[in-house]
Amino acid sequence: MVVLLCAVAGQFGCEALRNSRGMQITYNYVKTADGVTLALRRYKPDQVAADRDPVILCHGLGYNLLFWDLADRTSLARYLAREGFDVWSLSLRGAYPSSQSLNSTLRKMSRFNLPPEMLKTLQKRLGDIRITNWSVDDHIQLDVPTAIAFVQAETGHKRVHWIGHSMGGMVMFAYLQDPSRARNAHSFVAVSVPMAVFHPLSEPLTFMHESENALRLGSKVVGSSAPAAVGTVLGDMGLPMDRLFYNGDNIDEGVLRGLFYLAQEEISPGQLGQLLAMVRSERFTSVDGQMDYTGGLCEVTTPTYLLAGTVDNLATVGAVQFAFRQINSTEKEYDLFGRVNGQRNDYGHDDIIIGRQAKAEVYPRIAAWLERFPCRPHESDMMLQPVVPSSAAAAEEEG
């Protein structure tokens, strides 16, 4: 197992450095109001289109910013950069290389996952490992506003495009319900985003619901490290929980192993508890129950493009269609990806971004949506008060 993990580590470590011609890739850091460090990986093309606002990519639950860049053939980050967009891939708190708990860091090391950026920043940010728990509310109220303000300041653009996968889209739907904040978003691309969970549950969600106590215990004892290590070596094991996250027939084994090795992160008790409550109640609410984010969808007026997969067992077709109907955006679109609409395969939760044909069938639709919303004249010239990053941007060397 150790030998295999080391071999896989070498393979993916090289892949991450390839194919960066035509763009500069850097890591950037900024602190939230409560002192947590957030990381953003910037893909700045040599020629940035003047009429395009920057794009922020936000991963889902249990992943990090590398979800968007596992390999060149499944990298939405590089695809959009080559289309002339200034792309910023965000890691929310708890995800590499943003602030992580000590347990997360140690568990990564135990499976020989030692990303170069983690090694470079670990000694400089020892205080960051003090965080032990966080909720989705923390992402909404602290992480998202900080990331957007940082990108605005660094680029001089008044607004950004936000592309969120799963939880990375849920936090944006919640953020957009505040009109004073919504003005910062030019458009929103919601990829496989469940803002409701309808009963009766799908078979994989039923398994998750019935295994709630075991999931809580497993999260505390071994976290994601054990399944990530096994998945790195064995790939698709066809387990019931796996069917929540991907269609095994629509994803290359090498990419899947890369997902487990590079992008898998720990899920905090707060995150897990909040999302398990959603499975029970059918609604996405704040931890204290005071905010009903599902009920607040009607407050969203930002231009929004919603994508769903025909065999997504987490963000089901019905759940995505529900969000589409509830939002009050005058400009909104919905696309369903699968054989029924001419795609070469049926799409699941993760493979709508990292699937075999996603680059050919999904990415162009996303780019076309973004191109519909050029920034207004002089809007990109509005320089905002700079946000001082917690450490200097580190340029990634080309391989």
Tell me what each language-model feature is.
Residues 57-63, 165-166, 309-310:
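Glycine-rich His-Gly loop
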Residues 333-399:
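Catalytic active-site module of serine/aspartate enzymes centered on a nucleophile-bearing elbow/loop
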Residues 16-47:
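N-terminal cap/lid segment of alpha/beta-hydrolase-fold proteins
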Residues 302, 316-326:
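Short alpha-helix in the alpha/beta-hydrolase fold that links the catalytic acid
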Residues 300, 306-308, 312:
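Short beta-strand/loop motif that positions the catalytic acidic residue
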Residues 45-106:
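Short, surface-exposed "cap/lid" segments of acyl-processing enzymes
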Residues 153-158, 163, 167-288:
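Alpha/beta-hydrolase-fold enzymes
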Residues 109-153:
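Alpha/beta-hydrolase active-site loop
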